[in-house]
Structure formats: C-alpha cells, structure tokens
Amino acid sequence: MSLLTRITTYSAKPALAGAWGVVTYGELGALIGRAQQSLAQLKLDRPTAFGLIGEHGPASTAWLIALAERGHFVAPLSGNAAEHPAKLALINAQWIIATSDIGWQLLPRVDEPSTHPLFTQLSDQGSAGLVLFSSGTSATPKAMVQDFSKLVASYESRHESDLVMLALLGFDHIGGLNTLFNSLAAGSLLVIPLSRSPADVASAVARHRVAVLPASPTFLNLLLAAGVTAELASLRVITYGTEPMPESLLLRLKAAFPRVRFIQTFGTSETGITRTSSPEAGSTFLRFDDPDLEWKVIDDELWLRSRTQIAGYLNASNERFTADGWFRTGDKVEQGPGGTLRILGRLGEMINVGGEKLMPAEVESVVLSVPGVTDCRVRGEPHPLTGQTVVVDVVATASDHEALRSAIRAACRERLARHKIPTRVNFTCAVSGERFKKTRWIR
C-alpha cells in the first residue's frame, strides 16, 4: 500500500501536532490534493526542481508527498529562501515553495530547467528526486541526490501503530524525514515541539503523551541536566544515534527512565537509516537487521551498501564510494560476538599521542561519570613532543572547579591508560554538538 493510500486510509486519525494544533490524516490528504492541483496549474512538461522552504508541518509534508507522487525533484531547506541562495542555485530550482504551518506561497525563480546528469538519470527511470545537503561544518555542503520514489516506497511495509512519536531533527535531514515517513506509514501522531530546547520537548511529550523519542546522546544528556524527567513519564521507547553513546550516560539514562526501552539506531545521509537491534538491554553494541543493507569492516572502518543509497553528489566526487557501490562511512567500529558492532567514533577524530591512538568517546564516558559533570567534549591538541595531547572541555554544575578537576583526573587515572588521560581540563558554559552531525542521523 503506497504512502498516499495509507494516509487516505487513516483519514480520521491525528497525523501532525504542533504550533498549528492537530491535523488529521484526512486534513493532510486534502492538503496534498491542493498541492497536486497547484502543480497541475503550472502545466509543467518535464520533471522540475523545487526548493521547499520551511520546517516540519502539514504544508511541507503535503508538498513532499505531492512532489514525490508527480516525479519532481525537491530540496527541503529549513528557514527562509534568503538563507539558501547558493543551494537553490546549485539545484537550479525553477520554483520555490515557502511553507508555514498549513499554508504556502509558490514563487517562480528561474525559467531554465536543471540539466544535471543525476536529475536526467532519475527522470529517465521515472523516479522523483530528493536533494539533501550535508551540514558543511568543515567545508562546502555536499548536495546528495536520492531516488525519492524508492525511498518513500521503502516505508510501505510498516505496520499500523498508535504510538505517538516526536520529531527532533528537521525535514531537511535524512533522520528527520525517516521519523516523518515512519510515522505517516504507521498512521501514528507525530509531534513537533515549539523548539528543540529540553523544556519545550518535555512540554510537548507531556501534552501529547509521546511514547517514542528519537534523540542523540548529547540531547539526552541535556534532558537529564534540565531536570525535566517527571514530564517524560509517557515515554516507552528512546532511540538514540548520531554519535557514540557513553556507557556511563546510558547507565544514568536507564536509572532515570527504568520503564523505557533504549534502542540504538544507525544511518548515514548517503545510505539512509538502517534497521538495527541491540543484543541486550543496556548494551552499546548493535546489530544490523535490514534486508536492504550489506555491511563489512575494512581496517576497523565500517563500509555500507544499501538499496536506498544516494545516486551521487551534485557538487562533489563519489570518492567515498567504491566502484562496486560500497560507501566508506569514516566510522571506526569494534566488532563483537554474533555479528554485532560498537560505533567508537569518527576516524578523523582519532587522537594520536606518541603513536598510541585513542577515540574521544572512551575518555568522555569516564569524564561524564564524575558527579558534577553535565557534559564534555574530548579533543586532541598539537604537542611538541608527542604530536598530540588529550584535552577535555567540561560543562559543570559544581562551583568548585579545582575540586572537580582533581576528581576528573583521579577517575581518568583509575580507569584509563596513561596516554588517554587529559593533560588539560577546561571549564566552559557549553560544548559544540557539531562533531558527529555530518554523516549519521537518528530515526
């Protein structure tokens, strides 16, 4: 059953909740019909590139489905069009759809259609196209082109469910789209909080009795620090991904939410979100349970090949893909028993201290276990003798920083090899959450 057919079938059920109130599947279906009528009035004689501007909401969802159904190309972009001139130019968007809750404006941009070979390839296959951009935190954002028709079809086997879900990642990320399409295919209610602050998320969970919360370990740590666990009593499942989960944080989370099932997820923008399972409760290992995915480990790096991986990049080479379609993720992994894996971190984040290598996540797990530490980031800094040295930036609730610094060093000396012990402990108000955003998303 197609996604659009499912939406029609679920007519009376609530579909999307947010600042606009609650929209039913029937009302969402009517919005999709209006969007399709607007497309018909344009009298387009070929697949066309659209920039879809906005955030999660009824209008943006309606247009995503309408464009996929009609075989067009779409780049979902958060914010407003003025923020994305380079991205709109790169896809040569002929039209801009500026959405806001349940309304939209359809604005012409250029007359000439896009002639990029990847768009032509998808058009020849009769497929719609989806363009997602990498975060671009360290370079120009990469424009990744996906077979949108194939991606949407991958959700057609989902079972109906009444579990209420919450969306944290935006509709311009593969993780945010995965949450959206999973919810729509299951006929569930998807809740969009007013903001991604712990307070607003907790308020949305309490108001709509959210049962499933997809989040990153960093955000889950912020929830604990915010003291809002009492408002999260309705939660039954927390899925986590985007970065390694420190074992010490997982233990704290399980103590704070004893009735919640924790599921580790994994995915990349290039290969999509993968179905996974955990070998046992509380384990930081995962197992891939996806018939559409192949995986292998080469020199401790995870390689993936999936049925829904991207067709290519608009503005970059495919050097991270092998000739036979394997994607080199850049993730360092540890292999466990029974085909399980543990994500240790990004290979590019590895710290080399005098020839001894370590991953930041191992040190972060120890530092986070120290009472008074609410968050931390471990990084390498240049050192004239050892090449690099370990530094940790700490967010703390404790006011006595010297005592906490001593406690952190004592914990590290007790549990870590000498080369892994931070040589400097800095205290700060906040730490960057950008380190892992490039390739991994939650569902």
Where do the protein language model's features map onto the residues?
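Conserved pre-ATP/AMP-binding loop-to-beta segment of ANL
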Residues: 11, 112-133, 145, 160-165
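Conserved AMP-binding/adenylate-forming
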Residues: 21, 37-80, 168-170, 357, ...
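Conserved AMP-binding A3 loop
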Residues: 24-26, 128-156
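Conserved AMP-binding/adenylation subdomain of ANL enzymes
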Residues: 152-164, 172-211
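Gly/Ser/Thr-rich phosphate-binding loop
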Residues: 212, 226-283
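AMP-binding/adenylate-forming catalytic core of the ANL superfamily
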Residues: 213, 306, 332-420
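Conserved ATP/PPi-binding loop(s) of AMP-dependent carboxylate-activating enzymes
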Residues: 296-324, 356-358
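AMP-binding/adenylate-forming catalytic domain of the ANL superfamily
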Residues: 414-438
